[in-house]
Amino acid sequence: MNLRGRPKCNFLHLGILPFAVFVLVFFGYLFLSFRSQNLGHPGAVTRNAYLQPRVLKPTRKDVLVLTPWLAPIIWEGTFNIDILNEQFRIRNTTIGLTVFAIKKYVVFLKLFLETAEQHFMVGHKVIYYVFTDRPADVPQVILGAGRQLVVLTVRNYTRWQDVSMHRMEMISHFSERRFLREVDYLVCADADMKFSDHVGVEILSTFFGTLHPGFYSSSREAFTYERRPQSQAYIPWDRGDFYYGGAFFGGSVLEVYHLTKACHEAMMEDKANGIEPVWHDESYLNKYLLYHKPTKVLSPEYLWDQQLLGWPSIMKKLRYVAVPKDHQAIRN
């Protein structure tokens, strides 16, 4: 076998190799530089001055600010909204807000939307998804730039309990068919409320729940969980972290889809067995959140009834509050 030509070939390879390494390093550097600029590291990083966080000076000493599973509990004073706003704007985030205005509840819609325009996700892209059986009664509200309203016509039910429980079915259905393509996060809210102070991107997380204003200081034995073992919403007396309100929850669209789908399926199983939980969809929500821990928990600042509970000093702000009403007149 003639080997005389091989050394020449090896010298050629040795000459090409350094050149190839140089090309890879050069273009790799260009790619990483371009990527860092676009991801805000370091080119787009915030230049706003803000107070340095101090390890030995907690933001709040009067309330719990972290769950045992390391999810933050959001209170006034625990976050810097300027930093958060910039981070979510870099991601070009769009937030969906669902609200059900079925039957007489459509009367609350104007105040709900007007106060949302003043306080909800100001400066960010928002799509309001209004579920209603009365599309002609949806009020005209002036919306800010980057914000839009979508009316989704759905059927009503004779009993208000059925209206409440079928909310999970509708959110699940539209999350799969539509919301996944249109928004990054979904916030699910009750119509008979109003925004009274800032509610912004500090609430956004993979999955969040809100502490019920009536039970935030109570022991688990006082929680009004569903206690019948026959129900899919059943929670034993010795279990439970918090009692969450059904009027304000959300997260990524995918996680909200998983939640609402699981709750709806549990409802259907209970219905087949003639069982209706004590607090309807809220009972299923609490069961789900017990075994699928939220990645963020909102304090009662984000769900309050001032008429019933006043304004305790622990609440620095009341952000999302109940509108005074005659429950019987509205529901019947």
Curated annotation (Swiss-Prot):
Q: Which residues lie on this side of the membrane: Cytoplasmic?
A: 1-13
Q: Which residues cross the membrane?
A: 14-34
Query: Which SUPFAM superfamilies does the record match to this protein?
Result: Nucleotide-diphospho-sugar transferases
Expression across tissues is:
Submaxillary glands (at protein level).
Q: Tell me the residue numbers annotated for binding Mn(2+).
A: D190, D192
In this entry, the parts of the chain located on the Lumenal side of the membrane are: 35-332
The biological process GO terms on file are:
oligosaccharide biosynthetic process; protein glycosylation
Q: Which Pfam families match?
A: Glyco_transf_6
| Single GO MF annotation | glycoprotein-fucosylgalactoside alpha-N-acetylgalactosaminyltransferase activity
Query: Which cofactor is essential here?
Result: Mn(2+)
- Any GO CC annotation of this UniProt entry: extracellular region
Report residues binding an alpha-L-fucosyl-(1->2)-beta-D-galactosyl derivative: H212, T224, E282, D305
Q: Which family does it belong to?
A: Belongs to the glycosyltransferase 6 family.
UniProt remark on domains:
The conserved DXD motif is involved in cofactor binding. The manganese ion interacts with the beta-phosphate group of UDP and may also have a role in catalysis.
**What residues bind UDP-N-acetyl-alpha-D-galactosamine, as annotated?**
F100, A101, I102, Y105, D190, A191, D192
Annotated active site: E282
The record's Gene3D superfamilies line, in alphabetical order, gives: Spore Coat Polysaccharide Biosynthesis Protein SpsA, Chain A (3.90.550.10)
Stated membrane topology is:
Single-pass type II membrane protein
Pathway assigned in UniProt: Protein modification; protein glycosylation
Which protein is depicted? Histo-blood group ABO system transferase
Chief site of localization: Golgi
Could you tell me what reaction this enzyme catalyses? an alpha-L-fucosyl-(1->2)-beta-D-galactosyl derivative + UDP-N-acetyl-alpha-D-galactosamine = an N-acetyl-alpha-D-galactosaminyl-(1->3)-[alpha-L-fucosyl-(1->2)]-beta-D-galactosyl derivative + UDP + H(+); an alpha-L-fucosyl-(1->2)-beta-D-galactosyl derivative + UDP-alpha-D-galactose = an alpha-D-galactosyl-(1->3)-[alpha-L-fucosyl-(1->2)]-beta-D-galactosyl derivative + UDP + H(+)
Give the EC number(s) listed in the UniProt record.
2.4.1.40, 2.4.1.37
How are cofactors bound according to the entry's free-text note?
Answer: Binds 1 Mn(2+) ion per subunit.
